């Protein structure tokens, strides 16, 4: 395990990489490095907006595929994003190859994952913390129905 750093954000990978080329999107403020996909996700922000940068070809600690396979998989996924374009689906700003990596830059979307398995132990240790799933369960019926309407609106696009 090697500690990598971009701005004040530290993350663990199997190898040391220089991610300073991401500085064109601003400053790093968030990272997910424990993925089985062989991708690392880095949140970047400049004075005007935030970006979600997904980078394939990185040898993550939890990778279930090789770096080269992760590049192929992400490139295939990008085609699906374009095919499924919808107002409620995160939008791709750009995608490109960079050295051995494949990079997809998305608009940032604030929110939480309803099934954030990486935090299960955190919620068990701190019973005062509510998981996103618990927060969703506590929403009013009208807000839950609105969420379902958004989901169904998206699913109408899927063939």
Place the predicted regions along the sequence by residue:
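Activation-segment/catalytic-loop signature of the eukaryotic protein kinase fold
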Residues: 95
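Structural motif in protein kinase domains
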Residues: 109-131
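Short alpha-helical scaffold element within the canonical Hanks-type protein kinase domain
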Residues: 137-148
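Conserved short submotifs of the Hanks-type protein kinase catalytic core
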Residues: 99-113
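Structural motif at the C-terminus of the N-lobe alphaC helix and the adjacent alphaC-beta4 loop
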Residues: 77-87
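Protein kinase catalytic-loop region centered on the HRD/HxD motif
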Residues: 153-159
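Juxta-kinase regulatory segment immediately upstream of eukaryotic protein kinase catalytic domains
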Residues: 1-30
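ATP-binding glycine-rich loop module of kinase domains
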Residues: 37-79
């Amino acid at each position: 395990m090697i500690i990598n750093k971009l701005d004040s954000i530290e993350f663990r990978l199997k190898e040391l990489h220089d991610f300073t080329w991401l500085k064109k999107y601003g400053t790093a403020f968030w990272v997910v490095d424990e993925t089985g996909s062989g991708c690392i996700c880095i949140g970047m922000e400049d004075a005007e907006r935030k970006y979600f940068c997904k980078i394939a070809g990185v040898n993550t600690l939890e990778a279930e595929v090789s770096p080269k396979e992760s590049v192929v998989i992400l490139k295939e996924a990008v085609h699906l994003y374009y095919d499924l374009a919808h107002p409620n689906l995160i939008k791709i700003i750009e995608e490109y190859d960079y050295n051995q990596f494949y990079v997809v830059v998305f608009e940032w979307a604030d929110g939480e994952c309803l099934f954030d398995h990486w935090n299960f132990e955190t919620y068990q240790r701190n019973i005062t913390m509510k998981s996103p799933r618990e927060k969703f369960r506590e929403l009013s019926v009208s807000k839950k129905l609105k969420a379902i309407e958004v989901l169904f609106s998206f699913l109408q696009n899927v063939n």
